């Protein structure tokens, strides 16, 4: 009966509407308990809609003959008062259902109902029937107000038209925008499906520290905090990688964590300062096996949650069923930049000339590896629409990845791109403690040269590697971006319940 909802009092000042509702709340307080908490529901709206969906089978007569008694509670989303009988619609977490209310049955409760407002939370008890228009309805025998809503909801025609308001007041967005609720329900299912997939393959879920003595595990600028009792500066983690690999050293050969990371960097449609990552490590796996795993977990999650491997994302139709393309970074750069030769890819002077020609800004400290990455990000990344693994990154930009046995200067690393966006990063892990120590030293020099995102030297992690870490493959998947892909969302803020926003003025 949503089409019967009365047009909201648009000309009325919101403050006056709030004042009216506060007056009603005052009257309720005078009558006793204004916010009762003794109602126990037995059913959900969506479950009833599903169970009795067959209108030809479950006619009004059949429903009333079944004599099913139900108790529901939810938010009043629409009401239509017609004198001795009225209709209303309530919404709970599962969906909506119509109420059929009769004055001669409900008595004083019916009189009270006439003064209730859309947005109030109510409880109803009764049997089931079907209206002449075929809509399943609860034929109320009892009706109560549980929570008085003091602020009017946005009208149904315009909803929350201000996108920023949707993010700031997600609680309102979830009430009035079914599509927003569906995104977050899918998000929960996606994470649950990933956990089940990994658990079935003997991966162990673990928890590692959120506050680190030394920021590490990724090239990123950390948030800093201070431990008062210890008088010690700490860092919110940018990645759990080094702790998870310590666990592999300890003999936990398949571990994963789904949790928050924090990076003190910019905000965009793809970046939020805090975000959710899946990070996993598997002993005796190479980056080739980890690519296989990445491909399969994404494909199976899509099929399990959506029932399909074909999705639309930001104007592109993505097919997750075929094998994902695997393409070396230097080959991808040369394909999109025919002027760059194979020899140029490891020649710093040549790459500097190409960056100047392409108007790519670089820093004097960049080596050939960083320059190659800059060219890739500027000229190739945005073209990768269908799922593509970009492999074999330079050592300079991969401080934790194992060096290639066959390609000097490169690593056994990959990143997964879909529709021009990075979704995953993985590699064969560097388990040579002396090589890792040298890479940390290079990162320290880069930091001293002004690179805020370069890593610190982690002596304890080197000590752990000196005990011996099995050959290992690792993976990180950005859960937020994966949810964006599988829900067709174009902004990371659409898949975060409470995205970062500047404080309201």
Curated annotation (Swiss-Prot):
Homodimer. This is Lysine--tRNA ligase. The keyword Aminoacyl-tRNA synthetase applies. One of its GO terms (biological process) is lysyl-tRNA aminoacylation. Pfam families: tRNA-synt_2, tRNA_anti-codon. It catalyses: tRNA(Lys) + L-lysine + ATP = L-lysyl-tRNA(Lys) + AMP + diphosphate. GO terms for molecular function: ATP binding; lysine-tRNA ligase activity; magnesium ion binding; tRNA binding. Its EC number is 6.1.1.6. It comes from the Bacteria. Transmembrane segments: none annotated. Keywords: Aminoacyl-tRNA synthetase, ATP-binding, Cytoplasm, Ligase, Magnesium, Metal-binding, Nucleotide-binding, Protein biosynthesis. Mg(2+) 2 binds at residue 422. Belongs to the class-II aminoacyl-tRNA synthetase family. It is found in: Cytoplasm. The lineage of its organism: Bacteria, Pseudomonadati, Pseudomonadota, Gammaproteobacteria, Lysobacterales. PROSITE patterns: AA_TRNA_LIGASE_II. Mg(2+) 1 binds at residues 415, 422. InterPro entries: Aa-tRNA-synt_II, aa-tRNA-synth_II, aa-tRNA-synth_II/BPL/LPL, Lys-tRNA-ligase_II, Lys-tRNA-ligase_II_N, Lys-tRNA-synth_II_C, NA-bd_OB-fold, NA-bd_OB_tRNA. GO terms for cellular component: cytoplasm; cytosol. It is an enzyme of class 6 (ligase). Binds 3 Mg(2+) ions per subunit. Its cofactor is Mg(2+). PANTHER family: LYSINE--TRNA LIGASE, CHLOROPLASTIC_MITOCHONDRIAL, LYSYL-TRNA SYNTHETASE. The keyword Lyase does not apply.
């Amino acid at each position: 009966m949503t089409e019967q909802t009365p047009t909201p009092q648009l000309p009325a000042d919101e403050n006056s509407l709030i004042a009216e509702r506060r007056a009603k709340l005052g009257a309720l307080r005078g009558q006793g308990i204004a916010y009762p908490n003794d109602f126990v529901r037995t059913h959900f709206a969506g479950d009833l809609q599903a169970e009795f969906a067959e209108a030809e089978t479950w006619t009004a007569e059949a429903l009333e003959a079944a004599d099913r008694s139900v108790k529901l509670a939810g938010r009043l989303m629409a009401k239509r008062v017609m004198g001795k009988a009225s209709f209303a619609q309530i919404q709970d977490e599962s969906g909506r259902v119509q109420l059929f209310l009769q004055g001669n049955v409900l008595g004083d409760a019916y009189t009270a109902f006439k003064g209730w407002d859309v947005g109030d939370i109510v409880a109803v008890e009764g049997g089931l029937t079907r209206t002449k228009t075929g809509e399943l309805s609860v034929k109320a025998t009892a009706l109560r107000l549980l929570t008085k809503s003091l602020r009017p909801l946005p009208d149904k025609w315009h909803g929350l038209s201000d996108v920023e308001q949707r993010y700031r007041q997600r609680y309102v967005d979830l009430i009035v925008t079914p599509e927003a609720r569906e995104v977050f329900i899918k998000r929960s299912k996606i994470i649950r499906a990933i956990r089940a997939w990994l658990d079935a393959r003997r991966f162990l879920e673990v928890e590692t520290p959120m506050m680190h003595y030394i920021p590490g595990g990724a090239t990123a600028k950390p948030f800093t905090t201070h431990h008062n009792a210890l008088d010690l500066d700490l860092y919110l983690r940018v990645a759990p990688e080094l702790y998870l690999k310590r666990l592999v050293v300890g003999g936990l050969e398949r571990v994963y964590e789904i949790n928050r990371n924090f990076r003190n960097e910019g905000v965009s449609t793809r970046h939020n300062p805090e975000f959710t990552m899946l990070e996993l490590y598997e002993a005796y796996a190479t980056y080739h096996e980890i690519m296989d795993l990445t491909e399969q977990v994404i494909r199976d999650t899509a099929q399990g949650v959506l029932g399909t491997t074909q999705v639309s994302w930001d104007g592109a139709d993505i097919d997750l069923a075929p094998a994902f393309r695997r393409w070396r970074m230097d080959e991808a750069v040369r394909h999109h930049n025919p002027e760059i030769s194979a020899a140029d890819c490891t020649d710093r002077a040549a790459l500097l000339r190409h960056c100047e020609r392409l108007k790519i800004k670089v820093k004097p400290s960049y080596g050939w590896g960083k320059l190659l990455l800059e060219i890739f990000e500027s000229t190739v990344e945005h073209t990768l629409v269908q799922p593509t693994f970009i492999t074999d990154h330079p050592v300079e930009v991969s401080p934790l990845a194992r060096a290639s046995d066959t390609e000097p200067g490169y690593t056994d690393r990959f990143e997964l791109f879909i529709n021009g966006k990075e979704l995953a990063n993985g590699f064969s892990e560097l388990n040579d403690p002396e090589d890792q120590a040298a890479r940390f030293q290079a990162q320290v020099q880069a930091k001293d040269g002004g690179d805020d995102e370069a890593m610190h030297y982690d002596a304890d992690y080197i000590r752990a590697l000196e005990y011996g870490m099995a050959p290992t493959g690792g993976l990180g998947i950005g859960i937020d971006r994966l949810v964006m892909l599988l829900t067709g969302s174009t902004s990371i803020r659409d898949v975060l319940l409470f995205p970062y926003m500047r404080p309201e003025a």
